[in-house]
Amino acid sequence: MPTPDAVCILTPTYNEAETIADVISDYRDEGFANVLVIDGGSTDGTRELAEDAGAHVVVQSGSGKGQAVREAVEDHIQAPYVLMLDGDGTYEATDATKMLDPLTEGYDHVIGDRFADMRPGAMTRLNRVGNRIINRAFAFIHGQDFRDILSGYRAFTRESFLDMTLTSDGFGIETEMAVECAKRGIKTTVVPTTYYPRPDGSDTNLDPIRDGGIIFLELYRRAKTNNPLFYFGSVGFASTATGLGLALYVAYEWVVRSISHEVIAVVSMAGILFGVQLLMFGVLSDLILSLHREQMKRIEELE
C-alpha cells in the first residue's frame, strides 16, 4: 500500500451532517491525515462538522458530484494517490488498505465491489436491479466487466485521472471513469468491499429513475468513441427492422387485400436505406477505431 502521506482521501459532500464527522474520523484513525472534503453548498452544517473532524474543506465552484471530483483532483489535490468515497457512511474505512494495495502493484484504478459484501438494507430492490442491468449493459457495450461501475469507492493515481476526458457534472462521473478506463486501457482491477445501509436520518441525494436514465444515456453516448459499431449499429438495426416490418405489412396488404399503401411503402424504404447506411457507417467507424488503437499501441511501444 502507498504510504498514508502519499494518499488523499477525497469526499464530495452535500448535506451529509449526519455522517461526515464519523467518516472523517474513521479514515484518520486508519492513518490518513490528508482528508479533503469538497462541498456542494450544504445547508446543514456539513462543512463545519468536517473541519472540526480534521478535514480540509473547500466549496466547489460549480454543482454536481462530477464537477466536484474533477475540481478537487485537478485544483486541490497534489498527492499521487487518491481514495475517493461518499460521505454517507456506507463504506468501510478498514477496506482502504485493500483498495490502495493494487496501486503499488501496477494498477492505476481500483473499483470497490459493493455487491461482494452488501449488508441487508444497503440497497433497495429497484436500485439493485438497476445496478445489475447497468453493469451488464456496460460489459456488453464497452467489453469490460468491472462488476460494479457505479461504486463510489474508488482508488486511483492522480496521473491516470488527469489522462481521462471527463465531462459529467452529476452522478454519471463513476460511469464516465469506468468508460475511460476501458477506452484508454487504464489498468483497472476490482476488489471486494463492504457496503452498509445509510444511517438513520441520512437522506440520499440520488434519484434512481432520473439518475439511472442519465447513466444509461452516458453509456450510450460514450459508445460513440469506444464501440461505434454498437453506437451506430443499434440505431441502424432498429431503423432497418422497422422498415422491413412496414414493407412486409405493405406487401401483405397489396397481395392479400389488393390495398396499396404508397406513403408507407416510401417510409419503409427510407427506413431500410437509412438503417443500412448507419450499419455500414458503424462497421467503417469500428475499422478506423481498430486501426487507431493499433497505431497508438505501436507508438507507446516505441516510447
Curated annotation (Swiss-Prot):
Pathway: Cell surface structure biogenesis; S-layer biogenesis
Record InterPro entries: GCTrfase_AglJ, Glyco_trans_2-like, Glycosyltransferase_2, Nucleotide-diphossugar_trans
Source organism, top-level taxon: Archaea
TM regions (residue ranges): 230-250, 263-283
UniProt record similarity statement: Belongs to the glycosyltransferase 2 family.
Listed NCBIfam families: glyco_TIGR04182 (TIGR04182)
PANTHER family according to UniProt: RFBJ PROTEIN, UNDECAPRENYL-PHOSPHATE 4-DEOXY-4-FORMAMIDO-L-ARABINOSE TRANSFERASE-RELATED
Known function: Involved in the assembly of a N-linked pentasaccharide that decorates the S-layer glycoprotein and flagellins. Adds the first hexose subunit of the pentasaccharide to the dolichol phosphate carrier.
Stated name of the protein: Glycosyltransferase AglJ
Organism: Haloferax volcanii (strain ATCC 29605 / DSM 3757 / JCM 8879 / NBRC 14742 / NCIMB 2012 / VKM B-1768 / DS2)
